[in-house]
Amino acid sequence: MATYNGECWIEEQLKSIIEQKDVDISIFISDDLSTDNTLNICEEFQLSYPSIINILPSVNKFGGAGKNFYRLIKDVDLENYDYICFSDQDDIWYKDKIKNAIDCLVFNNANCYSSNVIAYYPSGRKNLVDKAQSQTQFDYFFEAAGPGCTYVIKKETLIEFKKFIINNKNAAQDICLHDWFLYSFARTRNYSWYIDRKPTMLYRQHENNQVGANISFKAKYKRLGLVRNKWYRKEVTKIANALADDSFVNNQLGKGYIGNLILALSFWKLRRKKADKIYILLMLILNIF
């Protein structure tokens, strides 16, 4: 669990993890030098659940959830666990979240798992966030498998990712979104990934979300800005370069508008959701990407 100034929500988040059914868990927390009461709340939980909760020593400022999660992956000894989950600080997990994920991994003989979620707003409004469309040939270059807080990964797979980010420190640290990067790593290394249609948690939405659900007009407008200012393209390129991928996509990224037009000819292979396929087609043709 990566935390930063989450005092309003972290107690509910921790309770929902501790109350998971039919699994034995350990929680490792890395706090990014919070300036509110987050760390104190975590320490109080640690006193109540000393065999479950472990708080990593505070080090330098990470400045974002991605680098904080990279720190957790590198510093936690993964060998003693069968499966590893990522947790945000502000969500509510359904009580069977982890057990359901493990059952799906076993039944489908998969290495990695993610799921749909229910976006949960301060007003009480709820919306399904559907990420479970069929995976495409190159979707992993352009999107994550879903919210990282739904990821459940077999130990052996995450250990390989851990080795990779340790051996490629500079490249890995430069990639903002750990969940997108892990999905790309898994797919390029032929690890099987199962995306569950069943929602497994309430995905809390508030003004401090680093990413959040892409449902509202405001959220969509914000993400359009990330495409227009080339942040999105830069992240795609950094992931492709870090993974030393020699695919069709990577070969087009350095060709400017010509490369965009070539990618546009295979637009249906670049995203999972139909609307997102059309969206990226337009971004490529209009040279916004």
Swiss-Prot record:
Highest taxon of the lineage: Bacteria
Record's keyword annotation contains Transmembrane: no
Listed GO biological process terms: lipopolysaccharide biosynthetic process
EC number: 2.4.-.-
Key words, A-Z: Glycosyltransferase, Lipopolysaccharide biosynthesis, Transferase
Pfam family, one: Glycos_transf_2
GO MF, one annotated term: hexosyltransferase activity
Pathway field: Bacterial outer membrane biogenesis; lipopolysaccharide biosynthesis
InterPro entries: Glyco_trans_2-like (IPR001173), Nucleotide-diphossugar_trans (IPR029044)
Broad class of enzyme this protein falls into: transferase
Homology family: Belongs to the glycosyltransferase 2 family.
Name the record gives this protein: dTDP-rhamnosyl transferase RfbG
